[in-house]
Each structure stands twice: as structure tokens, then as C-alpha cells.
Amino acid sequence: MKINELEPNKKVVNLVGELLTLEEPNEIPSGAKVQDGVLQDSTGQVRISFWEDNAGKFKQGDKIILQAGWCKMFENELQVSTGKFGKAIKYTPPQPEET
């Protein structure tokens, strides 16, 4: 999935991108841990929020796959998130085989 394919109120599956910016994780009043940033790919940029176990897991410049998440409109912008039960992992692009 690419950023230009995102639609509000839809699931996000296997979105691959690079973390352009990433704020420090913080705790919101409900006690949940959240970390915000900007994810980019060759088609654009989107705000991203990592929640709970996914917050604090990555650093700026990491390539990630948002394997299970959601997309919504937040402050008039598209935003993707792991939500409470989503999953994001670090992505290592396949390297060409040496001959």
C-alpha cells in the first residue's frame, strides 16, 4: 500500500515508508502512551501515530511497515495509526544478490 492510496476511515495494511520526523513518546491524560511523526514514501507524506507498545520502538529515518492500522482525518489532514491493537515493524529492504 502507498500513501496516495490511503482513505479516511479505512484499514491500513502493509504501508511501507520512512519516518521523516518523530517526536518523543508521551503519555496522554488517559494514561496511554503515544508517539507522533511523519511517514513518507515515493507518493507523499502522512502523519502517523504509534500507540502503546509501538510508541518508542522506532527512530527518525527508520523504514517501517504498518502491517495493521487505520486511517482517519485529524485536524483536516489524513493520519495513520497503529491504534491499540495495530502492528508496525522495522523494514529492511531486500538487498540485491552479489554475483
Predicted regions and their residues:
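N-terminal leader/targeting segments and the first structural element of proteins
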Residues: 7-8, 18-20, 24
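Short beta-strand segments
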Residues: 15, 44-48, 78
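OB-fold single-stranded nucleic acid-binding module
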Residues: 23-31, 53-99
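Hydrophobic core residues within well-ordered beta-strands of beta-rich domains
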Residues: 13-15, 19, 64-65
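Short boundary/loop segments of OB/S1/cold-shock single-stranded nucleic-acid-binding domains
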Residues: 1-11
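A general secondary-structure signal for short beta-strands and their flanking turns/coil
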Residues: 10-12, 32-34, 63
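OB-fold (S1/OB) nucleic-acid-binding surfaces
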Residues: 22-48
